[in-house]
C-alpha cells in the first residue's frame, strides 16, 4: 500500500487459518482471506475499508504453505526445483454496508468482496547448496512455498513468470488498485 502512496494502518488479526480439506488451489486463500476479514469485522466502523490477503503456492495438486522449520523449507524448495508452480493470492475487501435488517436487530452488516489472482512461476534446477544457503541466510519460514521472489532465490531460480510479479510477493497491487478506485467512486 505504501508503494501506491495511499495512507493505511496495519492491524494484526488473530484468525483461524485452517480450511476445509476439500478446497483446492485458489479456493484455499479465498477462504482464509475471508476468514481473516470476518475475524476483524466486529471492529470495523462506517467509512473504514479493511483489506486482508492470503497467499499459497500450488504444486502438482498440493498446497505448499509456510514451512515450520528448515527441513520442511528444504523439502518445499526441492519440490519446486525445475518445475512450474502456481502462486494464488486472495484479497478481501470488507466494509460496513448501509443496509439494515430486522434480522440483525438493525445492526450494520459487513460487505465482503474477494478477488483471486494466479501467477505461474517456473524455477530452475536448484542445488542442495543453493537451497541450504537460501534457508540459512533468508529464513523463509513466513513465506508460502518457502521462498520470497524478491529475495536472492528469486534472482537465481525464477526463470519464467506468467502473471503478476506482485502477486508472487503476496499482494497483487494492480488488481488491488483497480478495486480501490471502485471503492473510492462508491464512497
Regions found by a protein language model. Give the residues of each.
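A short small-residue
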Residues: 12-20, 154-157
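Short loop/helix-cap segments at secondary-structure boundaries that form the rim of catalytic
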Residues: 1-4, 20, 43-44
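Short, conserved active-site loops that position catalytic residues or coordinate cofactors/metal ions
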Residues: 10-15, 52-55
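Anionic-ligand binding patches
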Residues: 24-187
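N-terminal G-site helix/loop of the GST-like fold
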Residues: 1-11, 183-186
Amino acid at each position: 500500500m505504501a508503494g501506491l502512496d495511499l495512507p493505511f494502518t496495519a492491524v494484526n488479526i488473530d484468525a483461524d487459518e485452517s480450511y476445509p480439506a476439500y478446497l483446492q488451489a485458489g479456493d484455499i486463500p479465498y477462504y482464509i482471506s475471508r476468514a481473516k476479514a470476518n475475524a476483524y469485522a466486529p471492529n470495523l466502523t462506517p467509512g473504514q475499508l479493511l483489506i486482508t490477503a492470503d497467499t499459497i503456492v500450488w504444486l502438482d495438486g498440493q498446497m505448499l504453505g509456510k514451512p515450520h522449520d528448515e527441513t520442511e523449507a528444504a523439502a518445499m524448495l526441492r519440490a519446486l526445483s525445475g518445475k512450474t508452480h502456481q502462486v494464488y493470492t486472495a484479497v478481501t475487501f470488507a466494509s460496513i454496508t448501509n443496509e439494515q435488517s430486522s434480522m440483525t436487530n438493525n445492526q450494520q452488516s459487513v460487505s465482503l468482496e474477494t478477488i483471486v489472482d494466479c501467477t505461474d512461476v517456473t524455477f530452475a534446477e536448484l542445488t542442495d547448496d543453493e537451497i541450504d544457503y537460501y534457508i540459512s541466510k533468508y529464513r523463509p519460514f513466513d513465506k508460502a512455498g518457502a521462498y520470497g521472489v524478491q529475495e536472492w532465490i528469486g534472482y537465481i531460480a525464477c526463470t519464467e513468470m506468467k502473471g503478476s510479479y506482485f502477486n508472487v510477493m503476496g499482494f497483487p497491487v494492480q488488481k488491488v488498485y483497480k478495486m480501490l478506485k471502485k471503492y473510492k467512486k462508491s464512497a
